[in-house]
Amino acid sequence: MYVLKRLELRNIMSHFNTSIDFREGFTAIVGRNGAGKSTILEAILFSITPHQAPRRSSMISENSSRGEIYLALQSSEGRLLELRNKLIRRGGGTNTEAAIITLEGRRIASKPTGYKEEIHKILGLRGLPNPASYIEKAIIISQGGLQTLAEILSEPKELRDLLDAALGYALLKQAISNIGDVVLGVSPDGSPVKLGSKSITRLQSGYMTLRNEVLGVDREIREASKRLEELEREREELERRARDLESEAKALQSEIGKLETMEEMLVNVTSMIRSERSKLDTINTRLRYAESKISSIDDLEKRRAELRAKASLAHEVAELARLQSRLDKLGRDLEMIRDAVEKLEVSRRLKEIESARREAENRLLEARSSIKEEQRRYTLLDYRVTRGRSIVTNIRRVLSECRSKDLCGSEKPESVLERLDAVINDLESKARALDQEASALEAEARRLVQALSMLEESGGSARCPVCGAELPPGRAEAIARHYRHEAERLRKAAKEKAAEAEKARAEASRLQDKRRRIELLLSRLNQLEEGLRELGFQTPEDLAKAEQKLRMLRERLEELRKLENSLEEKVRNLSREEVALREAKTRALEVLQRLGIKEEEAREKLKTLSSESKKLERMLVSKAEDLATRLGITAYRSLDDLLEKAREALEGVDKELSAIERRLEEARRLKEEAAKLKWEAEQVMKRLEELEAEEKKLRKEVSRKSEIEARLKEVQNTLAELDDRISRIDREMGELQTRIREMKSRKASGEEALKLYLPAAASRRIMEEIGEIAYRRLLAVLEDEMNDILSRFNLDVAGVEIREKAAREIEVKAIGGNGAYRPLEAVSGGERTVLALSFVLALNKAVGGKLGFLALDEPTANLDEDRRRSLVEVLRGISVEGLVRQLVVVTHHEDVRDYADTICLVTRTQQGSRVECTY
């Protein structure tokens, strides 16, 4: 039998991270409405049904996309069964992402598809038609479930339906009905053979009818076989004639094949003639083209001479480019010398810049020294002020907490402490006095109980417990009632005194807590004031003065930092300018050194190079104009443009010369090709004459083909007629064979049905008798188990009787203490609830499942105090008597805690539901 071991919930409704360890015995899950108690049972139900829960579509917590339920169960032998379901929110509902079953550390299911079958097999529920419904009615009972079950016990038809579901009787009835619907075979007329719901006489009549049909089919098979043999003989004669005609057709087809080969040869010869004629035309075309090209050789040689004259100007273009390159280099040297001379002029301000930079750096060092000193003073004062502010804030917070309404209020803390000491002493004295009074009342009650025992044990000769005199029976009973009533009153008074004492001690404990809080606040206040004095502040006014001085230091620091920034910027600018001047002078000297010019000769060298550049430029312009005239270039933008156009013109001349050379070479080649083409044309003409003679011969042979084809067609038509006749015979034979096979199949099916008919009828009768026996056995077991459970409680209902009425309805009668029957409607509501509980326990034992726990959701809801106390006492008795290994009750009534072995308190906070268990 499996009981609950551990439950873990991750993001399940209001439970974000909940773990509960269950133990055997009576477990009470207590909490206010909406705290999340019922979610615990819903999660257990979801794990073992499987995946059935009242609010499955919203089981995952809000603002969460995934959730997880882990349930561990332990068997009587100590085997651990672990069920883990991982949920995911998808669309508008909740889907099971993974469903894992682990037994003794071995995984036996990991997908939702295999989860259901495995959990039913492990928990012994595979024989039930609807295990989920059974668990919800008899294992995990929702709010109002016991009352509903008590009402079902009074309704014979509904009770029958419930027992049918638990026993699986509906499946047995369906199995019996299925035997009647099973097709045992097919009769020879094609109708299915079934038992249905026929009587024995009708079943025997049906058997004889089926046997006669089988014999009739056997006669039809013999007649069809005789006709099939006649058709086979006729078919053999037709096939012999067809073979003779096929031999003649093959000879004709062979002759036609030879003629078709000749036709192909004729086509090939014709194609070769066309090919040779096309080849001759191509040769003539190429010959005419070659002759036209040969005629243009003289014009090409004249044009080649003109182009060679222009190509000789390439040397002058190269000379002009060289002069331009020399002029460009001279211009670059002039530019470099001119730039170096200008930079040397500017670098004369270098000493002035160096002096200004050193002065700015000295001022910057002085400013940084002042900033460092002021920063040190500011940091020390800022630390003292910050610590002082924090201490003053804490002092105010402590004073505010101390002056709160539930501590000191407007009184001084010392006065409140003195008053609390007095009140606590009074409450403790009062509690001791009340304890003494309660003990005295308990002792008096025990004395009365002892006297009552003496009266009851004395039997017929009762004596007065005070004087020992013999009492008449009526007087003895009156005294016993008086003692019993007085003892009950004294016990009640003792409990009230004990409750008052406990209340006084609780109040004293609360006041002691309040006193300790005030003492802690006073100690904290003294520590804070001492810390303020250690910082050098005797009063808050000293702190305000320090804050004003701190602001002045901050303003002074800001002014010094602004001065520092301006001086740093000035130093950077002067340094950059100094570096730039030094670099300019260095670069100028490097340029002059690279050109081999001394610093003092730079100006004179600049004038000399300028004069040389102008002279070279005039020479270059003269040569460029002459070249443009000879090449025919009329317009150009610059010397570079002229050189580019001259190079393009010379490239065009070179290309045209190359093309002319190629054309001249081609013309010489064409002269040789023309002679070759004339010879090829003569050879093609000879081959044409030979092919035309062969074509004439082939056409004469091919003309015989039409006569042979006519005879072949005649033979083929005769063969087609024979094939058609053979096909008709084959179809008729096929139909006969099919019909014979069908009749044999019908005969075999009928014979098979005859073999199964009588055994199936006997099986149906046996199953009907087994169902009735099992049902009567279940009712007897339920009655015995319920009476055994009820005998353990002191109830007005001593037992029950369960009987089957007409129309298969179940009636439950209550048996009073005097042995008289009582209808369930006359039984009190509390006793009907106990009957429902005993029915659930008896049904679980009769079904034989492997779940050893019972869970009830709010069973005490809508009950008055007396009925609630009675029900809880019964639940406690069920646990103590061992009628169920583990009883879990979810309720919002706090008084249930006094009866439970394990108490789990469920509370709801902003962070979700919390569960704290006391064992």
Swiss-Prot record:
Organism from which the protein derives: Aeropyrum pernix (strain ATCC 700893 / DSM 11879 / JCM 9820 / NBRC 100138 / K1)
GO biological process: double-strand break repair
Domain of life: Archaea
Cofactor note: Binds 1 zinc ion per homodimer.
Name the UniProt record assigns to this protein: DNA double-strand break repair Rad50 ATPase
Transmembrane segments: none
Gene3D superfamilies tied to this protein: Helix hairpin bin (1.10.287.510), P-loop containing nucleotide triphosphate hydrolases (3.40.50.300)
Record note on quaternary structure: Homodimer. Forms a heterotetramer composed of two Mre11 subunits and two Rad50 subunits.
Residues the entry annotates as binding ATP: 33-39, 143
